[in-house]
Structure formats: C-alpha cells, structure tokens
C-alpha cells in the first residue's frame, strides 16, 4: 500500500504497517486462512467532503483485507440492493442539485436511507476500521465509530496526524 496515496503521517503509517504485518503472516495450517477469515469489516471514513469521495483509501486497503479472507462492507460501494442512494459519483451531483433547489424534504428522505443502510452495515460487521482526518468534516464516521463501540466491536481508528492530533472524545472512547 502506498503511504503517499493516503498522505499518512508517521503514527498512522506505523499503525497500518503493524496491522498489515499481523494480518499478512502466513497461517500454519492450510485448512484455515487465519483468524480474520470469513469475518466482515466495515470501512468508515470521510465521504461527503473528501476530494475523492472517500474511495481512494478504501480501494487501496481492500485487496489486503480480502487477501485475509475478509468480507468488505464499504459505504462507497454498498453491497446491498436495498439502498436506492449512494453519496458518491452521479448521486453526489444529484444531491448537490437538490441542495441548490432547497428541496430539504427530499434530501432528508435520501439521507435517512443512506444512514440506515450504513449503520446496518456497521451492525452486521464483525469489526470496524475508521480513517479519521481532522481536516475533513466527518459527521457520519463519528456516528459509525460510536455505534461500533456501543456494540462492543473491535474498532481500529487510523488517525491522520497521529495520536497527538486525535480528538479527546476519540481518546475517551
């Protein structure tokens, strides 16, 4: 995985390197891929205000996680047919048009469905990996992190800027 593509600081690189070294170790038996095999991971992180709609870091991390036998639950690539809306691509342009037209009721209905599906993915995930950048507004990411923690799921937070830049709320969770 390219550190430059994610623009990570040293603490974040260390966390990801440690995680990758741990999950990429070969399993001693051929029957079982590893502890993570057949588990589901939700990838939380900025979407609305991310320059690439939050797709880049997820696409970069996904092959490593799939190699470990994980099922990826990605809000930028929803694996469910029940959600009619997505927050990226053409749908993002449509959302912006509705904002410009001040069609708040329609936007609220769309947002409710997006939130419902994303939080349902957090609910069915076995653990969560969250990418947090203090310079990007991440309302949904915080909700997903706190939902994961309320459900007592393992929650890995990769914070751009490292521990020194992390919010006291995240430290307290």
Regions found by a protein language model. Give the residues of each.
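Conserved catalytic or regulatory cores that recognize and/or transform ribose-phosphate-containing ligands
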Residues: 2-173
């Amino acid at each position: 995985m390219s550190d430059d593509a994610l623009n990570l600081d040293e603490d974040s690189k260390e966390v990801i390197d440690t995680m990758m070294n741990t999950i990429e170790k070969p399993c001693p038996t051929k029957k079982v891929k590893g502890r993570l095999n057949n588990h589901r991971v939700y990838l939380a992180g900025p979407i609305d205000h991310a320059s690439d709609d939050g797709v880049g870091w997820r696409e970069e991390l996904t092959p490593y996680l799939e190699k470990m036998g994980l099922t990826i639950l990605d809000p930028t690539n929803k694996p469910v047919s029940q959600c009619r809306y997505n927050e990226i691509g053409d749908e993002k342009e449509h959302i912006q048009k509705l904002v410009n037209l001040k069609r708040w009721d329609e936007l609220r209905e769309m947002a409710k469905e997006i939130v419902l599906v994303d939080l349902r993915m957090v609910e069915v995930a076995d653990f969560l990996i969250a990418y947090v950048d203090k310079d990007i507004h991440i309302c949904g990411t915080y909700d997903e992190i706190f939902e994961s923690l309320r459900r007592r799921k393992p929650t890995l937070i990769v914070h751009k800027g490292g521990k020194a830049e992390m919010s006291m709320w995240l430290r307290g969770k």
